[in-house]
Amino acid sequence: QIERFRSEVTRHKLEVVVSHDSYLINLASPDPILRARSIASFCQELQRSGALGLRAVVSHPGNYLDDRDSGVERNARAYAECLRAVPGELEVWIEGTAGSGTALGSRFEELRALRNALPDDVRTRVAFFLDPAPLPAVGYDLAHGETVWEQFDSVIGLGLLKCLHLNDSRAPAGSRGDRHEWIGEGCIGPEPFRRIMRDPDLAGVVKIIETPKRDDPLRHDRRMLRRLRAYARGNTQVTAGV
């Protein structure tokens, strides 16, 4: 199965393939038993993804439950332990969150602190993955998209932004919610996505849709891809049916 998967990736000329770790994993947990289980599970995720020849494993930071700074430290130690246990070129791309409850990773400064807490020998294998959907929910202004990416560049550096999940949002600004909607049809609207698709600074960033599937997943995915390609061409008259 592994060889068949690798063969299909080559046949379809897929340049970047990533996986997403289990949502049950909590590498920031103060509970030693839960944290140990999470570390074991994340190591298995890395091993499987490495065997499949993937570029990276996408990982949400954990929930700290007690103290935020301690959670960042625990999360970083766990990433380091797992990356050392599974050497190679496979990377971890930390995905920003909506920051609900005690979830880490809603602010760029917190993402930077998490990566900076990693030892030198594994830090180069860790980068970032953002989803526009929760950005307004935690206070970032996508209506003026240049500002968001300038902020990221100033705090972390755009060179460390490896991938974007392209989703509109059903969660209003400031809600700390993360509920996806079809691109251009949610609280974010079409204009920020047009800018993303035409921004030369984001041209080398991988873009993956994660929009709702509803009644017909393949049809809706194709519709979203057509819409994004139209945005990239500068089309400003894309209708809801496209």
Model segments located where?
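Gly/Pro-rich active-site loop or hairpin
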Residues: 69, 104-112, 136-204, 212, ...
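Structural preference for beta-strand elements that scaffold enzyme active sites
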Residues: 15-18, 55-58, 89-95, 125-129, ...
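Active-site acidic/histidine proton-transfer and metal-coordination neighborhood
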Residues: 27-127
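Active-site beta-loop-alpha junctions enriched in small/polar residues
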Residues: 21-24, 62-64, 95-101, 131-137, ...
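Acidic (Asp/Glu)-rich catalytic clusters
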Residues: 1-18, 43-53, 80-89, 115-125, ...
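Alpha/beta catalytic cores of nucleotide-metabolism and tRNA/nucleoside-modifying enzymes
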Residues: 202-206, 233-238
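N-terminal pre-domain/capping segments
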Residues: 1-21, 25-44, 234-242
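C-terminal helical cap(s) of enzyme catalytic domains, especially alpha/beta-barrels
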Residues: 217-235
